[in-house]
Amino acid sequence: MNTIYRLTFVLLTLSGLAYAQQSMEACPLHAQHQAEKAKAAHQAEVNQRGAQAMGFSQTKTTHHFRLYADGGAIEVTAKRAKDLASRQQIRQHLQEIAQAFANGDFAKPQHTHVQVPPGVAEMTQLKTEIAYRYEPLRRGGRVRLSTASPDARKAVHEFLRFQITDHQTGDSDAAQP
């Protein structure tokens, strides 16, 4: 008798799980929920690899990517004004990438995003036509990317638009004057 109860329990459990799976897939928001979960998982991975590549916590800092008529800017700031450690780490990182990018070295963004970001091949090829200038900010720093070359500017904008999307900053992808 005990075996019959166990078998009944197992059958009811399995049929309930099968019904729940069908119900989830029939839910009109299921695909949206799955996409949101995937986006959150991707962001967590970007943050983890970013912390490794950049040397500071991605959750204690804020990234902004600005597009300008002559190029753009990468800005990183500490969320808390008194977070001096993050501010120093940001400044060190931005000084390093300004020099690395000028040399055509985009290893850190490639590590962070597990791919060669759009625009990098062209930025590497046109590296002598792009100026990378580090500027300190009160809570961090900025790398200003500027060029007179239309091809280099297009590559810089592609690169920054990718950063906006992958870091989920919400920054405008339209060039400002």
Predicted regions and their residues:
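Bacterial N-terminal signal peptides that target proteins for export
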Residues: 1-8
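Bacterial N-terminal signal peptides
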Residues: 8-16
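Intrinsically disordered, low-complexity terminal tails/loops enriched in metal-binding residues
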Residues: 16-177
